[in-house]
UniProtKB/Swiss-Prot annotation:
Signal sequence bounds: none
Name listed for the protein in its UniProt record: Succinyl-diaminopimelate desuccinylase
CDD domains: M20_DapE_proteobac
GO biological process terms, semicolon-separated: diaminopimelate biosynthetic process; L-arginine biosynthetic process; lysine biosynthetic process via diaminopimelate
Family annotation (NCBIfam families): dapE_proteo, PRK13009.1
Record flagged with keyword Zinc: yes
Gene: dapE
Active-site residues, as the UniProt record annotates them: 75, 141 (proton acceptor)
Amino acid sequence: MSDQSPLALAHALIRCPSVTPEEGGALSFLAERLTEAGFSVERPVFSEAGTPDIENLYARIGTAGPVLVFAGHTDVVPPGEAASWTHGPFSGEITDGFLYGRGAVDMKGGIACMLAATLSFLDRHGPDFGGSIAFLITGDEEGPAVNGTVKLLDWAKARGERFDHCLLGEPTNPDSLGEMIKIGRRGSLTGRITVHGRQGHVAYPHRAENPIPGLLRLASALIAEPLDGGTAHFDASNLEFTTIDVGNPATNVIPASAKAVFNVRFNDDWTAETLGAEIRKRLEAAAGNAVRFSLDLQPSNSPAFLTQPDAFVDLVADAIAAETGRRPALSTTGGTSDARFIKDACPVIEFGLVGRTMHETDERVAVADLDRLTAIYGRVLERYFSS
């Protein structure tokens, strides 16, 4: 295989053990290939108290507009027990038409396709193609996401960098390549409810105040009615309780407090502030004067957002349809991604590989999908800079 093929590039990246926060050689590999292709490359390191230092990569070729950004992350989640894998998690084994390894789909495979498409595009057009291409790559997406894309964007802005559009290579397709583009993401808000009672002996309930019935009352109030009915591009917002805790191993003691944690994935009807106010209103109405509670809402850096379907969305969808024969759905489903940060810099959409095995043992990608995704990204580049 050519060392410029997406398979060769993905194989090399997978062999870099870049579990967050380790760089593992992945950014060094990208920097070398991009530098050889004529990009200016920088690798800023960002820090914050209580979090590990993270190395990032910013590369650009061209000085004119428009500027198309390819974005992604080289960090991966831990592989778990290596013995559970059919092939080593960082071996990059190629078997029966599949490339195995942690990050194969999330998202070293996607980065390899972006790089392969860009190198091929530059081979055809040279450095004077009527615009600029940038790579915005972090090593802190699977971790706290504190010293990664959000700070890399601030760093780039301070240097006068401006972007027109961004394509983020997250694995957006549920089952087969070409199914789905992400044009937005739901927001995420986490909260903790604590109901305050008074500890006592179960044989003397009149001397105690059991917080558990009150907590159940409040929890029921939050899920009794839907938060909304969905919007044009989003499903209805969804609140799920993730834990209810009393921390009481004794069977003859009424506990002093009871706690519950919930998470809401919310649509563009809400901001974190308006949603928090609605949750508090429902809790206060249910509590009345009978239940003493406190509500702690964790600060959210995950707002709901939407990139309005426009000419850029159509351009990417057309490239996908030309290569796969299907028109992708425009979706806002799934979890959060670094698109939530990029949206403040420029319009961003996401399209990458099939995510069925991401974060799993034996994560793998079809070699044919690497070739097809590279062809799609190549079509995007051709159409973007010709238009």
